[in-house]
């Protein structure tokens, strides 16, 4: 409910020593439709005005070239926007979260779509649930790729396997981009699980706060517009 989430949000803000009186506005990016209205009401209760809702129709600082822009995840667009504003070149943006996504932005700032894979944790959970003789392990990088026991073999398959998948996709996407006449893309990675994979990935730039920076940029670009707000 709104009240339950408000207690959690107030607690997080208190832990960060942030006063609501300092808030000039709010941005809401939601990929869970049933919670969008809940958090819209919550934020309006907290700051006295509705948040700006992230939408493909708002100013993102990039253009969108996909079959159905409205279906592209807002988190993917926000990450792409933040990365492009920093690098201003062709990009592959990798987000290691619930899903693992690799998205493409051209050198002239056009979001071209990308790749969506099951996330590392989802894959691990399915493996542990469906394979009767396998058991849950911590997602830590083993010392060697070749595991001498089931625990290390599982860790190797998950960590090195996902790292290899991402590296392979980066190479394939890069080839496709270059064939279209674009410069070799810069790879940018973010997400809660990115740090676990970073040591085995090749030539990627890590930004743990890419999404937050993207939301702030979105606010700056849209704070004077009414589009995207709940009216």
What are these regions, as identified by a protein language model?
Residues 93, 100-105:
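Short beta-strand scaffold segments in enzyme catalytic cores
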Residues 96-99, 142:
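Short, surface-exposed recognition loops or helix-turn segments adjacent to catalytic cores
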Residues 1-91, 108-231:
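Nucleotide/phosphate-binding catalytic cleft detector across ATP-hydrolyzing
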């Amino acid at each position: 409910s709104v009240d339950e989430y408000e207690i959690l949000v107030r607690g997080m803000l208190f832990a960060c020593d942030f006063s609501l009186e300092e808030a000039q506005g709010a941005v809401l990016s939601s990929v869970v439709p049933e919670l969008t209205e809940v958090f819209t009401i919550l934020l309006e209760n907290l700051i006295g005005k509705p948040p700006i809702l992230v939408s493909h129709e708002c100013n993102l600082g990039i253009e969108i070239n996909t079959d159905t822009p409205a279906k592209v995840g807002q988190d993917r667009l926000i990450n792409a926007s933040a990365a492009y504003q920093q690098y201003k070149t062709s990009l592959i943006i990798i987000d290691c979260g619930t899903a693992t996504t690799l998205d493409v932005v051209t050198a002239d700032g056009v979001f071209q779509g990308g790749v969506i894979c099951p996330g590392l944790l989802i894959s691990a959970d399915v493996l542990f649930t469906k394979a009767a003789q396998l058991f849950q392990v911590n997602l830590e990088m083993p010392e060697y790729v070749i595991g001498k026991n089931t625990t290390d073999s599982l860790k190797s398959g998950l960590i090195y396997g996902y790292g290899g998948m991402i590296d392979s996709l980066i190479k394939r996407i890069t080839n496709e981009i270059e064939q279209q006449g674009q410069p070799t893309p810069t790879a940018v990675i973010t997400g809660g699980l990115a740090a676990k994979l970073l040591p085995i990935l090749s030539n990627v730039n890590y930004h743990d706060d890419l999404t937050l920076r993207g939301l702030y940029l979105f606010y700056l670009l849209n704070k004077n517009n009414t589009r995207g707000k709940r009216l």
